[in-house]
Swiss-Prot record:
The keyword Hydrolase is annotated on this UniProt entry: yes
Catalytic reaction equation(s): O-phospho-L-tyrosyl-[protein] + H2O = L-tyrosyl-[protein] + phosphate
Top EC class, one word: hydrolase
Residue span, Tyrosine-protein phosphatase domain: 1-182
Protein's name according to its UniProt entry: Probable tyrosine phosphatase protein H4
Alphabetized CDD domains for the sequence: PTPc
EC number: 3.1.3.48
Gene coding for it: H5
GO terms for MF: protein tyrosine phosphatase activity
Catalytic center residues: C142 (phosphocysteine intermediate)
Cross-referenced SMART domains: PTPc, PTPc_motif
Keywords, ordered alphabetically: Hydrolase, Protein phosphatase
Length: 182
């Protein structure tokens, strides 16, 4: 199990988007996985990025610009530019959005989740090879930050363990995750 691979978070609300982006920048995260719908009423998760290319949103001192949107078969991958205007620092963020997993539900197609996990890990591996420094933790969120988020991280860890050891014990995997606070 890779320690500090993930930051598990609730979906940002309108009043916490600036804090969310501050965390992403401070933790040097370059990948975000969103496992929830967004809504304008701010009940589930506020729309903290623009779903159209070449548009931007400002949250306090942070500006988020959408550079590219790539529609995959079951999720949307978006390249964003996050800029802290007070320090003029910026970072490219890869955002993976999978809104088809309902709260308190199961994924309708487990192969889609496995594909999403594979693509996220592929992007992280690619970034580790090309970056001057190691990318920070992957930020994973749903609405509350526990159910779908925890399941995503558990599946990722179980798959990693299965590849390395040819066996997996889910209860032990969950306990390790809880103890390490990945």
């Amino acid at each position: 199990m890779e320690i500090n691979k993930f930051i598990c978070s609730q979906g940002p609300k309108k009043n916490s988007c600036e804090d969310f982006w501050r965390m992403v920048l401070e933790q040097e995260s370059c990948i975000i996985v969103s496992l929830t719908e967004t809504d304008d009423e701010d009940q589930v998760c506020y729309e903290y990025w623009v779903k159209e290319e070449d548009y931007e949103l400002a949250f306090g001192r942070y500006v988020v610009k959408t550079l590219e949107i790539i529609e995959e078969s079951s999720f949307t991958r978006t390249r964003l530019r996050l800029t802290d205007v007070s320090s003029d620092t910026s970072r490219e963020i890869h955002h993976f959005w999978y809104p088809h997993w309902s709260d308190y539900g199961n994924p309708t197609n487990p192969a889609e989740i496995l594909n999403l996990i594979s693509k996220v890990n592929q992007k992280r591996k690619e970034m580790k090879k090309t970056a001057d420094s190691q990318p920070g933790p992957i930020v994973v969120h749903c609405s509350a930050g526990i159910g779908r988020t925890g399941t995503f991280c558990t599946i990722d860890n179980a798959l990693s363990q299965l590849r390395k050891e040819q066996t997996v014990c889910l209860p032990q995997t969950v306990l390790k995750i809880q103890k390490s606070k990945i």
